[in-house]
Amino acid sequence: MGKYFGTDGVRGEANVELTPELAFKLGRFGGYVLSQHETERPRVFVARDTRISGEMLEAALIAGLLSVGIEVYKLGVLATPGVSYLVRTEKASAGVMISASHNPALDNGIKFFGSDGFKLADEQELEIEALLDAKEDLLPRPSAEGLGALVDYPEGLRKYERFLVTTGADLDGLKIALDTANGAASVSARNVFLDLNADITVIGENPNGLNINDGIGSTHPEKLQDLVTETASDIGLAFDGDSDRLIAVDENGAIVDGDKIMFIIGKYLSEKGLLAKNTIVTTVMSNLGFHKALDSCGIHKKVTAVGDRYVVEEMRQFGYNLGGEQSGHVIIMDYNTTGDGQLTAVQLTKIMKETGKTLSELASEVTIYPQKLVNIRVDNSMKERAMEVPAIAEVIAQMEGEMAGNGRILVRPSGTEPLLRVMAEAPSNEEVDYYVDTIAAVVRAEIGLD
């Protein structure tokens, strides 16, 4: 990670850390870096989620892009993967999404996509950071006809919706509960599933700028679980603020997380001979039960660091077409170049329809090991160096010794927040509590801020 860019773009508290001034510079410098080799006038697509700070940052970012002669297509509220899709299919120079994904409304973020629809390489981010830190802005300042023009492009949303529908199946007879997190999916998910002939009920569809992800969406699926059982729905689908992830709920109200979703889609593709190299790419956070289920089906796996960008890098480098995270980021490379919650939802419901199986039946092959994750607030300067603290390293080694191979421990820094995450898996909840609580107590004593 760089000084400004984390694992998912630039993030911070809106108007405090991520200011309009910084957004202007990101537009100006980011736009320049991504379009400096264009032979024609560059075009950049810009979208946002529903946060109250979105329009403020959008205006500043667009001003920066226009100031270096870039033509800006303003998409309005749209899911992050919609930007990625449109950049590729409309042959734009780049795309920019203004969102902090699953974070609360006070935060916001800015992430860039290259002309290929993928997030930026580290080298490009470092080039932008060098311009941000330069003592003087020496980039061109065109005037008159050299300035960029702003184009409102609401039809981008409709094109993305039509794309999603073309990948699905007729869902007539399927009852679906949707939770759009008062976020970007609130403008599209209803339309997509109605076009697929599903019988739908929707919550989290009334954004006011402040209620995005607020007790709702993929990080808070409790309301959706209640809705599924109350309406006797066949499946519940919960998206996060920018709709790049999906958490599902089965007909009994039980959570079906990213691991189980990847298994269901992966097994379906494998049985049809469509899973590239018969392999799924996942991260170190995936549950042991997921790995065991893949082994039982003869499906291979590749494991990366946490973060969908690392999953995508592995997929691109070795030609895999399915990967993702337990948190619900699922990348289906045959269709899109980034995690896409609505696309994943369309594929999951298509599999239910084609197989005639309930979601609980499809997910039953994955027996999840009890897992506990604790987030401990630490100084940003310490979260990357926690393992250098002798007491922390010692307690982790002690707990791993007690596990004797029947479980695992993962201690890692958050890529976007000042947190150290302590996770353990073991055969019983009691064992998990013991391992996590013991390690967390030492971390708090040594470097915790609470």
From Swiss-Prot:
SUPFAM superfamilies: Phosphoglucomutase, C-terminal domain, Phosphoglucomutase, first 3 domains. The active site is at 101 (phosphoserine intermediate). One of its GO terms (molecular function) is phosphoglucosamine mutase activity. Activated by phosphorylation. Binds 1 Mg(2+) ion per subunit. It catalyses: alpha-D-glucosamine 1-phosphate = D-glucosamine 6-phosphate. Mg(2+) binds at residues 101, 240, 242, 244. Transmembrane segments: none annotated. Pfam families: PGM_PMM_I, PGM_PMM_II, PGM_PMM_III, PGM_PMM_IV. Its EC number is 5.4.2.10. One of its GO terms (cellular component) is cytosol. The modification Phosphoserine is found at residue 101. Its cofactor is Mg(2+). The keyword ATP-binding does not apply. HAMAP family: GlmM_B (MF_01554_B). NCBIfam families: glmM. Belongs to the phosphohexose mutase family. Catalyzes the conversion of glucosamine-6-phosphate to glucosamine-1-phosphate. This is Phosphoglucosamine mutase. It comes from Streptococcus equi subsp. zooepidemicus (strain MGCS10565). The lineage of its organism: Bacteria, Bacillati, Bacillota, Bacilli, Lactobacillales.
